[in-house]
Amino acid sequence: MKPLHIVMENFGPFIKETIDFEQVETDQLFLISGKTGSGKTMIFDAIVYALYGMASTKTRKEGDLRSHFADGKSPMSVIYQFKVNNQTFKIHREAPFIKEGNITKTQAKLNIYELVDNQFELRESKVNQGNQFIVQLLGVNAEQFRQLFILPQGEFKKFLQSNSKDKQSILRTLFNSERFDEIRHLLVENVKQEKVQIENRYTQIENLWNDIDTFNNDELALYKELESSQTDKMIEKFPQFNDYGCKILKSFEEAKNKITKELDDLNHKYKVNVELSENTKKLKAEKIKFDDLKKEQNYIDKLKQELKMIQESKVLITYFTRLQSLKKDKDELVSLHEQSKLNETNYHNEIKGFQKQLEHLSTRENEITQFNQYLEKNQVFFNQLDKIISSYQQKPVIEEEIKRLYSEYNDLITKKEELTKEMNNKNKDFAIIEHYTEEIYKLKKIIDESERQKKDEKLFDKLQLDKSSYLSKLKEKKEQLNEIESSITNIDATLIDLNDKKDFVNEIKSAMSIGDTCPICGNEIHSLGEHIDFESIAQKNNKIKRLESKKVKIRDEIIKIETRIEELNHRENELNFEKQEKKDISELQKQLNHLNQLKDEQQSINKLVENFEKQEKEIVNKIHQFDLDLSRKNTQKEKLEIQINDFERHSQFSSVNDFETYYSHAKKQVETYEYENEKTKDKLNELNNKLKIEMNDQKHLTENLTQTSKEINNLELKMEKEMQQLGFESYDQVKSAADLSAQKDEIEREINIYNKNYQSYEIEINRLKELVKGKKLLNLEELRQSIEKTNLKLDETNSQIATISYKIDNNSNKFNKIKNIIQILDDELKVQKEIFLLSEILAGKNDYKLTLENYVLIYYLEKIIFQANQRLSFMSGNRYQLIRREAISLGLSGLEIDVFDFHSNKSRHISSLSGGETFQASLALALGLSEVVQQESGGITLDSMFIDEGFGTLDQETLETAIDTLINLKSSGRMVGIISHVSELKQRIPLILEVTSNQYESHTQFRKN
């Protein structure tokens, strides 16, 4: 991942700041420089916050990132654009905050865009899904990104010197090694469960074996004493239990068959004798009933004679019945005709009475008409009596209210005139207040500027004084440096190179003779004496070293002085002081006070006028309201007067009660008249209708009476003829025959029942005689007792068979269950044996006394150390390498780091390193960790890295080595940014991102050296 642009709003000291990382060339090393607290580390916080919603270090919380100078309505937000795997993305993350005037936080926002065809397209717009998208895109979580992207202050020194427990916590987060410990825990729990399950299976076998039935056999009972672990012997004894049970079952089944046959014979005998006994009893009873039936023969013969007579006189009886009915009808018709005559006379009398009553009612018609007209005319008033009463009651109240309103209205008019007179010479003037405000602002600005000028002048004078002092020191140090360089130049250095070659010269001398050719210069040797003064050369060499050392020291002092002078110049430029004419601040303050007084006086007048205008407005509003109220009340009064006048004019009453009494009386008179008139007319109509009906009924009755008399005469002639033929002498004989005819159905029914019963008894007696013919009856009680005894014997045998069968089946089921459990147990023991062993190994019971997670973490740590040593060897001049301390102990061992010193050929504790050496080891370890985390996170490549502080502890040579390491790192394809205050880095690093602060807001700018 390579940063391209970042925009920070209300983020730390940055109110609205944009950094363009594209100004950093590919593979370029750059320095981030600025005062302490200017916000250098906040740049890293902004990048990490944009990606993961958190700061670059764990100690900073999201709420700590918001600028204290941000306004209450603007959110904290970061827009971060970067490139990863040749794809360009942009993230806009906005933090939640409590907006000014609210009590709840706003919602966090996150939008992720991808650059496609030179346009950004939205990929995610929800916070949770967006966070997951970023983790999947980069392949690392926030903690891993911190280790890869940023090397924070002191973090890797802590990691280098930490114990195994602390390292485990860090490495566990980076490499997600907790899953290995979870595997171990799962395996341990699995083993525990399996052991419990195996014990449960043995318990199941024991319980099932104890439940096996022995059929009261002593030999089988001995087998029950086998232990649950003796599974092979159990399986061997299973068939013996089954064979013995089947043998007992067979003997009981044979006995059952014998008893069943005996019982069937007894049941058959009992059934035959029960039927014989019942048939004998039934035959005797049927004979008795048949004899009783024969005794009714005479009565049945008499009924047959009566039936014959009824059938022969059927026509005569019909004539007689019809004649009796006609005579009865004739009597009723005579009675009805007489009653109708009487009714006709009564109806005529009633009609005359109601006609007289109707004539009397017609005399009041004019009076009732006048009442009706009055009622119609005043019905509206009668229906609204409550409203009219209310009008009479409201009228004096409204008149009093109008009087009160006129009084208050006049009071308000008077008050308004008094206020107008009081404020006659007072006016509002906001323009003059604005003028005073502008003048006050200008004076305050001049006073503030004068005070600032005074402070700047004082600071400028101090800077000039300090600068002059440092320039004097610089001049002095440069003179000292020139003197030293002159001294070094004046020393004869021609033979200095021979200082360490005395032994070499003596060896050559011992091998040469006078007259030989010199192997160095090629001339003839004339003498072998001492031509070189090695002691003098050594003295000169020591003097040069002292001077060089002093020279380096003075140069360092010169660099520090120049840095201080440069800093003073920078501060002087920032101050940008120019001498100006001094102004009298006390006089300006007097003018300011006078203007404030004038402003306050005019504000008081404005306030007084505003108060008057407010009161005047209230009075005008009240007057207007009184006008409305008076108009409304007068309107109400007019409506009431109109309503009262209408009532009195139409009703001719000034009293509502009198009107109500008269109206009710008139209404009652009309209603009574109309009711009586209508009732009389209805009664006359009803009587006339009844009279017509009665006269019509008389006509029909006369006709029916004539017809009935004629039919009676005809029937009497027919009856006399029929009586002569049948031998009847009187109507009494005919009446007796008619009475007997009514019983015909009952006579026929009795005869039929007798005949049917007679035939049925004959058939049943013959059938029963055949059934009992030639058979002997046995003792039923003795047979029943024999059957009961045999049934008890059979039930007992069946119970024994069922019990034995159940025991055999139950034993068989338990045997099968035991076999299944034994098979499962054997399979589990084969598999779990290896799992038990693996569980112990992963739990630390091994030669290395390491758990699985610690073993994995050691693997990662050794990879990190291998990567770190490639750089540490270079930085330490092949002197140091990191090694893992190997110690065998159960627990969190094996993660401590020692350092191996090739000069002493021994390893030593990491704390024995100096500050600079510790920085070298920490930097190497950090870079190594970064490499390994990248490899383990799916090969994601972070094309950038930032290092925060740590270089101040290094000497010049070590610093150069560290810078070379970082230069090699950036040349491998990374953009490397360094935060540091070390001045040598400013000289060595060509590109600087300067962070400047003006007390409350910071700004950034790239600058090239």
From Swiss-Prot:
Going by the entry's taxonomy, the superkingdom of the source organism is recorded as Bacteria
| Entry binding sites for ATP | G34, K35, T36, G37, S38, G39, K40, T41
Annotated GO biological process: DNA recombination; DNA replication; double-strand break repair
Q: Which Pfam families match?
A: AAA_23, SbcC_Walker_B
Q: Which GO terms describe its molecular function?
A: ATP binding; ATP hydrolysis activity; endonuclease activity; exonuclease activity
List where this protein forms a coiled coil.
Answer: 397-499
**Assigned keywords, A-Z:** ATP-binding, Coiled coil, DNA recombination, DNA replication, Endonuclease, Exonuclease, Hydrolase, Nuclease, Nucleotide-binding
The record's section on InterPro entries has: P-loop_NTPase (IPR027417), Rad50/SbcC_AAA (IPR038729), SbcCD_Nuclease_C (IPR053380)
Name the job this protein performs: SbcCD cleaves DNA hairpin structures. These structures can inhibit DNA replication and are intermediates in certain DNA recombination reactions. The complex acts as a 3'->5' double strand exonuclease that can open hairpins. It also has a 5' single-strand endonuclease activity.
Assembly information from the UniProt record = Heterodimer of SbcC and SbcD.
What protein name is recorded for this chain?
Nuclease SbcCD subunit C
What is the species listed in this Swiss-Prot or TrEMBL entry?
Answer: Staphylococcus epidermidis (strain ATCC 35984 / DSM 28319 / BCRC 17069 / CCUG 31568 / BM 3577 / RP62A)
Lineage at the top is: Bacteria, Bacillati, Bacillota, Bacilli, Bacillales
Q: Which gene encodes it?
A: sbcC
